[in-house]
Amino acid sequence: ASGCGLTEEMIGRLHNAGCTCYGDGWFPEKLIKDIHSVVLGAKVKQDNPELLRAKELGMLIQSIPEFIFQRTRSKTRVVVAGSRGKKTIISMMVCALRRQKLAFDYALTSKVDSLPNRVHLSYEARIALIEGDEHITSALDKRFQLEFYRPHIAILTNLSWSTETDHATPEAYLSTYQSFSVS
């Protein structure tokens, strides 16, 4: 794992999760042909040295939503999306799943107090709880993150467009959610 602006705490959490992390910054020399793929964060720019190296080596480059979908493809995907209230609904779902003693994976953008981290992907769980996001996927792919998840169960909280979103108009914002709801 690599990135610019990583704190010592983040690096420690990555190490504790079993990830190799060389520290704060970009390390294109660490990308070698033995690495299967590169997962591209939404804020990575097109001229990023690791991205350029991955392209040079012909590596599979995936956005975070693509990676999550591929890792949860055979699971029942429950996606909670919307402008506000996702964390509360996810917290209630975590409580219900645990009470029923159901194993589940999760990929969240918000910190949920009852979970040790924001991502847990396993081979055993048959359910994946995903926090959906309506933002642009990456510098290479201008589709919206919600377009990738293909939920079996979709839960929408309130929808509230603002000028700070990646959508130029309220109509474009609602269109993203309409596409998501029929995926």
What name fits each language-model region?
Residues S2-C4, L40-K43:
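Structural motif
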Residues G12-N16, E29-K33, A42-S183:
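Phosphate-binding loop of NTP-binding sites
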